[in-house]
Amino acid sequence: MTFPPLKSLLKFYAVVPTADWVGRMVKAGADTVQLRCKTLHGNELKREIARCVAACQGSRTQLFINDHWREAIEAGAYGVHLGQEDMDTADLAAIAAAGLRLGLSTHSVAELDRALFVHPGYIASGAIFQTTTKQMPTAPQGLDKLREYVEQARGTPVVAIGGIDLNNARAVLATGVSSLAAVRAVTEAANPEAVVKAFQALWDG
């Protein structure tokens, strides 16, 4: 079971709730975007994911679909992002056979080791700071622990997530992670497009 490698660095990674948001992130030039949709099901969900895929076509943006791996395969998405609990139920072999990239969430050393065992395209580590976006199973990891995770990942790209904004972004990036993911820093911003460009400038100058 082998997952395709990432086509390019993930860099700034926007996590958004709808296809409309995905389209905005693509137009703003985000390198990576994840659809984290918790409200739609069935055909509505399939249509939403198809809209996301269409929005990313012809762009450099890499699209990951959170959780809904069957629909992501059907729509021809770039990749799938799964949580630890999803690893028990998702058909990883089917995801790999369909040519989708895989990202996995981790919150501890044990989960990191488990994720690395299946050789994903990247692992996400968090929450780095306190966050209200979702209920987390562990306390905030902090920068020192994140730095240790980067070392233990042994070259697998690490995406930092959880409470990251433009005020702490440089400090997080200094730990050696290859990507910064943001949720509220984008979706609750007065000018989300400007926030994307400011994050992108951390890599692109």
From Swiss-Prot:
A family per Pfam: TMP-TENI
Keywords for this protein: Magnesium, Metal-binding, Thiamine biosynthesis, Transferase
Keyword rRNA processing set for record: no
Reactions this protein catalyses: 2-[(2R,5Z)-2-carboxy-4-methylthiazol-5(2H)-ylidene]ethyl phosphate + 4-amino-2-methyl-5-(diphosphooxymethyl)pyrimidine + 2 H(+) = thiamine phosphate + CO2 + diphosphate; 2-(2-carboxy-4-methylthiazol-5-yl)ethyl phosphate + 4-amino-2-methyl-5-(diphosphooxymethyl)pyrimidine + 2 H(+) = thiamine phosphate + CO2 + diphosphate; 4-methyl-5-(2-phosphooxyethyl)-thiazole + 4-amino-2-methyl-5-(diphosphooxymethyl)pyrimidine + H(+) = thiamine phosphate + diphosphate
Cofactor: Mg(2+)
GO annotation (BP), single: thiamine diphosphate biosynthetic process
GO molecular function per UniProt: magnesium ion binding; thiamine-phosphate diphosphorylase activity
Record-linked CDD domains: TMP_TenI
InterPro entries per record: Aldolase_TIM (IPR013785), ThiamineP_synth_sf (IPR036206), ThiamineP_synth_TenI (IPR022998), TMP_synthase (IPR034291)
Alphabetized SUPFAM superfamilies for the sequence: Thiamin phosphate synthase (SSF51391)
Protein residues bound to 4-amino-2-methyl-5-(diphosphooxymethyl)pyrimidine: Q34, L35, R36, C37, K38, N66, S105, K134
Entry GO CC: cytoplasm
Keyword Metal-binding assigned: yes
Disulfide cross-links: none
Stated family: Belongs to the thiamine-phosphate synthase family.
Function in brief: Condenses 4-methyl-5-(beta-hydroxyethyl)thiazole monophosphate (THZ-P) and 2-methyl-4-amino-5-hydroxymethyl pyrimidine pyrophosphate (HMP-PP) to form thiamine monophosphate (TMP).
Name the UniProt record assigns to this protein: Thiamine-phosphate synthase
Species whose genome carries this gene: Neisseria gonorrhoeae (strain ATCC 700825 / FA 1090)
Gene encoding the protein: thiE
